[in-house]
Amino acid sequence: MLDGLTYDDSESPSIALVPPGTSWEQVHDHIKIAHDFLLVQPVGSGYAGAYWTGTQMVVLEELGADQDEALDEFREQLGQRGEL
């Protein structure tokens, strides 16, 4: 489990902000247990969103380089996919 996550709950759903340097393996281990929506910033890349479908982790890449923009885009894509 990832410790010390901060959450953006300015809109629904609440999305956890993953600290820089967190590996995808750590993200997978956390999301498999907690089923949070996670915003991840991989090294050298824009933000990606990750969520658990019940059987696997899904990663939505290229949500933007700006955190606020990425949060908005992640929420929009979750809604379009029927995950909300």
Spans of features found by a protein language model:
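Negatively charged, low-complexity tracts enriched in Asp/Glu with abundant Ser/Thr
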Residues: 1-34
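Short intrinsically disordered terminal tails
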Residues: 1-5, 78-84
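Small side chains
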Residues: 4, 16, 46-50, 64, ...
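Short glycine-rich, low-complexity/disordered patches
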Residues: 8, 39-44, 83-84
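A short, exposed loop/beta-hairpin motif centered on an aromatic-Gly-Thr core
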Residues: 15-19, 56-67
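Intrinsically disordered, low-complexity coil/linker segments enriched for acidic/polar
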Residues: 23, 28, 45, 64-66
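Short aromatic-glycine-(Arg/Gly/Cys) micro-motifs in beta-strand/loop hairpins
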Residues: 40-59
